[in-house]
Amino acid sequence: MNTIHVDVVSAEESIFTGQARFVALPGEVGELGIYPRHAPLITRIKPGSVRIEMADGSEEFVFVAGGLLEVQPHCVTVLSDTAIRGKDLDDEKANAAKAAAEEALKNAKSDLDLAKAQSELAVMAAQIAALRKFRQKK
């Protein structure tokens, strides 16, 4: 069976390393699906869920808050400032952070404050969506 080596790395640690049959994640211009022997590619990724289909058919989920993707024919590397394993996502923390971002959006006094709040809100909305996807697959 053909597999591809996958590394998902955050600023703090390696989140996932292993062999996979397929990887799906949110690219900047749409959803990306990567199989072994994919053409080389470097692109930015949006906040969302990385779905890794293992060789045995099981799935692993990782939330990334955006980042970079490098694809080589036999290797996929996902680099993100923030990456959280699906099983480690916390509903309460995500909802509290989303509420804080919404409040910051209302109280933004400058364009920079507004942009930061919008970015944080988008990341938290993506994290909550990733959490829902992960719970559906359980």
Curated annotation (Swiss-Prot):
InterPro entries: ATP_F1_dsu/esu_C_sf, ATP_synth_F1_dsu/esu, ATP_synth_F1_dsu/esu_N, ATP_synth_F1_esu_C, ATPsynth_dsu/esu_N. It comes from Verminephrobacter eiseniae (strain EF01-2). It is found in: Cell inner membrane. Its main location: membrane. F-type ATPases have 2 components, CF(1) - the catalytic core - and CF(0) - the membrane proton channel. CF(1) has five subunits: alpha(3), beta(3), gamma(1), delta(1), epsilon(1). CF(0) has three main subunits: a, b and c. GO terms for cellular component: plasma membrane; proton-transporting ATP synthase complex. Belongs to the ATPase epsilon chain family. Produces ATP from ADP in the presence of a proton gradient across the membrane. One of its GO terms (molecular function) is proton-transporting ATP synthase activity, rotational mechanism. It comes from the Bacteria. Transmembrane segments: none annotated. Gene3D superfamilies: ATP synthase delta/epsilon subunit, C-terminal domain, F0F1 ATP synthase delta/epsilon subunit, N-terminal. The keyword Glycoprotein does not apply. It is a peripheral membrane protein. This is ATP synthase epsilon chain. Keywords: ATP synthesis, Cell inner membrane, Cell membrane, CF(1), Hydrogen ion transport, Ion transport, Membrane, Transport.
